Amino acid sequence: MKKLLALLLTLVMCLSLAACGGSGTDTSGTDTSSGETGEDSGDSSYRVAMICDSSISDGGWGMSCYNAMVDAAAERGWATEVSDSIAQSAYYDTIISYCDLGYDLIYAPGNQYTDAVLQAAEEFPDVAFALLNGGEDTPAKAVNGNVTSLLPNAQQVGWIAGALAGLMTKSGTVAFIGAMELDTTLGKYNGFKEAAAYVGQQEGKTVSTLDVVYSGDFSAADKGIEFAKAMIDQGADVFFGDASAVDSGARQAIDEANAASGSVSIYDIAQPSDLLGQNECIIGSQVTDNASLVGLCMEAVEDGSFGGEVIYGTLQNGALSADALSDLVPADVQEKYQGYLDQMVDGSFMQ
């Protein structure tokens, strides 16, 4: 039955591509949507397809991961396609449809796609599969050696945001919002929590992090609004998250709370790209250079060395960083923050 659904989906995609001439972007929330790389993409001999359960216009994770693929593809002359806002039940069928169409690389930005990727990778040994935030042990589970995990250091991601939260909180209470209970999300939460507490202690204050809450869905912006309001009521004044559109909903609630109070006193730290200026409450961003990680996968596909490895992203190799800070962060605090970031890079943070 799944094979039949996959074949039908492939037919629909072929007709869709023919109708639109292979270009254009449709992010309306249907099972498939076609993306574009650039003016040279149509002549490329290599093609990459991304699947995503959130929208690529969500202002967060989905958008950042899509842009990473497009940027890496543009640099190397690859053609791109994307299927976004897909349900969990459609992960496998959507992947298979791209494999049937002869795509060279399937890019799945999230640990939640692991089972579908491994199943498809077994059936299509000549297709490469890149799993962003995939487990360290996932490549070894691929019987054909055609799966690579791209793994930003989750603890360091949490540290980058947690240190800023520890410096900026006035209430001593900070908050973290998740979408799904993934190992990578828990790693970010724990890193955020320990860094906020440590930096707070260094600055002479006690900082606690509320228990993580999960929406169960990366697209549930309404849950972000609900969670943020409840956490603000519990005293949280700095937020971080790993929940895509849910984070966008949280920022909406934070902006509304600040507007009601007449001042910006509740803050949000964005990720995984620079979103400074998108919402008034955003004071900084933790940035992951996913484009460089995806680009390494494309290079490996081209030279025939792809698969069976974990590619790590860290502060030390430049894949992780903190971007520009808002003017809401005082100059002396910005200087202290840079000092803590330097400690993270040289390995002395929390030592």
Q: What is the meaning of each model-derived region?
A:
Residues 1-9:
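Positively charged n-region of N-terminal signal peptides that target proteins for export
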Residues 16-19:
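C-terminal motif of bacterial Sec signal peptides marking the signal peptidase cleavage site
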Residues 21-24:
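Bacterial signal peptide processing site
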Residues 29-351:
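A residue-level marker of the well-folded mature domains of exported/periplasmic proteins
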